[in-house]
């Protein structure tokens, strides 16, 4: 995780020097990482908060969910919701999702149990 933190800090510094301030951090779940590395990042996601930038989590239907469960991407909605909830616990700001209704329900329950309002609007941009 320290390598990832260092990588992002260097990139943010470079972007800020170029006058680019609006940056979102995406740890890249599923890209050039083992399943174990993906879960380590998810467990330690809050470490990225030190970068002072919004954190995007895109774990919906990823192999890190369906491979350990020995199923298919289409059959991991409950696992996706669990991973999204954990990401919210670990201070994710943005969830990239496939199943909008399930994500909205998870976010709503998270907000109710934590007495917080994550966003006044939830953007729904289906592909």
Show which residues each predicted segment covers.
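Active-site-adjacent loop and "lid" segments of alpha/beta metabolic enzymes
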Residues: 1-21, 32-127
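Conserved Motif II region of HX4D acyltransferases
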Residues: 28
């Amino acid at each position: 995780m320290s390598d990832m933190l260092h990588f992002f800090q260097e990139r943010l510094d470079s972007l800020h020097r170029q006058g680019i301030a609006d940056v979102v951090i995406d740890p890249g779940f599923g890209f050039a990482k083992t399943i174990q590395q993906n879960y380590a990042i998810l467990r330690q996601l809050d470490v990225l908060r030190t970068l002072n930038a919004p954190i995007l989590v895109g774990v919906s239907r990823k192999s890190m969910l369906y491979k350990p469960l020995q199923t298919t991407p289409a059959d991991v909605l409950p696992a996706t919701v669990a991973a999204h909830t954990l990401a919210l616990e670990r201070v994710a700001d943005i969830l990239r999702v496939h199943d909008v209704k399930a994500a909205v329900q998870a976010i709503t329950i998270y907000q109710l149990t934590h007495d917080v309002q994550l966003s006044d609007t939830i953007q729904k941009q289906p592909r």
